[in-house]
A protein has these predicted regions:
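Bacterial N-terminal signal peptides
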Residues: 5-15
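Secreted/extracellular ectodomain signature
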Residues: 19-145
């Protein structure tokens, strides 16, 4: 009886892991500018969503590393089955006066407001000099999956 309960406790979490959702927001960047993004959701795991988003950016022509692209980077991943999603963009000048652009993606299972806060945090995590109250941002995309 005791071993049956232990087996059941192990099976339930594995079943929850197997049914996790997957979403990824990947950015194409060049010399301090965010050129484009790809947002993929509905995959079985965030890694699969990330690979699909990278492939989408490659199809758009962002695979030419060295000449026209610094990198493609997954900025935010989610394992939520359902989520509120916000994508933001900011164009601003850094402390040296250089024009910059940056984007952030946010996910939340609770609300658009929480997804927006996650998008702001995401943008700050990848561009430390960006301040939302100083530089501002615009809403690019807002939806649920």
């Amino acid at each position: 009886m005791r071993s049956a309960a232990l087996i059941l406790m192990l099976i339930v979490p594995l079943g929850q892991i197997a049914h996790a959702g997957g979403a990824a927001c990947v950015m194409a960047k060049y010399q301090g500018q965010t050129l484009d993004y790809a947002l993929v959701y509905g995959q079985s795991h965030p890694d699969e969503a990330q690979e699909a988003a990278l492939a989408e950016l490659r199809r758009k022509g962002y695979a030419d590393h060295g000449r026209h692209l610094d990198l493609m980077r997954a900025q935010n991943l989610s394992n939520l089955d359902r989520a509120y999603v916000i994508v933001i963009r900011s164009e601003f000048r850094d402390r040296r006066g250089k024009a910059r652009s940056a984007m952030g993606c946010g996910f939340s299972e609770d609300s658009y407001r929480d997804a927006e806060l996650d998008a702001v945090r995401d943008l700050q995590a990848y561009f430390w000099g960006w301040k939302p109250d100083l530089h501002g941002y615009e809403l690019v995309r807002r939806f649920q999956y």
